[in-house]
Amino acid sequence: TEAKELGIHFFVLTGGEPMVRKKDILMLAEKHNDCAFHIFTNGTLIDEELCKEVQRLGNLSFALSVEGYAETNDDRRGQGVFEKVMHAMDLMKEHGLLFGTSICYTSKNYKVVTSDEFLQMLVDKGAILSWFFHYMPVGKDASTDLLLTPEQREYMVERVRFVRSRKCPIKLFTLDFQ
């Protein structure tokens, strides 16, 4: 309520994993139906029941974390997570929900996650946007080997801009979050 008094009507929810509180999020979205909520999630807790509620409410959108195809994604996010995210995308598309992806790119996956094939797969799944975040070495599994070189970074800047441009046949709104 204080935020609305300040003129703020768009909220971004991040984690940990915000969907562990999905009942609270749905209650918040219903109470504040004049606001929009964008949720960054790993996608593993998205199910049919949630999709029906989100469809009914109409003021939530999602960014699902994905870091490449199954092997690459699951190496970083856990075994079977890629398939769960693909299933979540299928459910969201089936219910006409607004969603995109959140992609952490590294020196190992940056070409794959910006390839025509990968991006078209996301569009075919129903994604309309992709947030790109460069890898930051923090936490117990931090690795400086995953940092991009200046040349790789320049490639990402140019590629993300190209995909977002009208010259690209892939219709996906891309943002490189710096």
Residue locations for each model-derived region?
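Radical SAM/AdoMet-radical enzyme domain recognition
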Residues: 2-14, 21-134
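Gly/Ser/Thr-rich loops at beta-strand to alpha-helix junctions
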Residues: 18-19, 138
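A C-terminal junction/extension of Radical SAM enzymes
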Residues: 135-178
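Pocket-edge positions in alpha/beta enzyme catalytic cores
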Residues: 17, 77, 145-148
